[in-house]
Amino acid sequence: FEAHAGDIDWRLLAAMAYGGFSFFMALGRFSGDRIRQRASATQLLNGGTLLGLSGLVIALGLPWVWTGLLGFSLTGLGFSIVVPVLFSLAARLVPHRPDQGIAFIANTAVVGFLMAPPSIGFLAEHFGLDIALSLLIGLTLIAWIGTKILARRVKAGRATP
């Protein structure tokens, strides 16, 4: 019975981490327009990716259950504004052709949706879940670098914030 109870506890904790991520993702999306009125797109992308990155580092780098829950909640909040802002900026990157920028972001997202689960599963099977989820830290660092490149393009007048 105790083994079964332990199994239920771990499932509950995993659900709580996903629930925290989802709740704060929704909270950020619902308040995103209000936040967008006070900050530029590049500030939101930079802040969102850094908050998401911080959440992942907390969730994966600290050994306590509560830090995992906190970390994944922060990740959801940080990432909540990134995708809507990316789509907004993408629509303005190619003058008079918003469809091209939006299609690029949408296709990139589809590749991510198709590649991430099997990649994480493969890495988890061979190296452990902590190593597999660390892939997300690397990808978030790449996204953060991308926000810096985009900020430079905005300052140079090649994109609109």
Can you say where each PLM-predicted feature lies in the sequence?
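Multi-pass alpha-helical transporter architecture, strongest
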Residues: I137-P161
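Helix-to-loop junctions at the C-terminal end of transmembrane segments
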Residues: G28-S40, A124-E125
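Structural signature of the two symmetry-related core transmembrane helices
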Residues: Q43-I58, W66, I137
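Intracellular juxtamembrane helix-capping segments at the cytosolic ends
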Residues: I81-V94
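A late C-terminal transmembrane helix in Major Facilitator Superfamily
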Residues: P95-L129, L136
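Short hydrophobic/small-residue motifs within alpha-helical transmembrane segments
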Residues: G19-F23, V110-G112
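Short amphipathic helix-loop junctions that connect adjacent transmembrane helices
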Residues: F1-L12
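Paired small-residue
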Residues: W66-L74
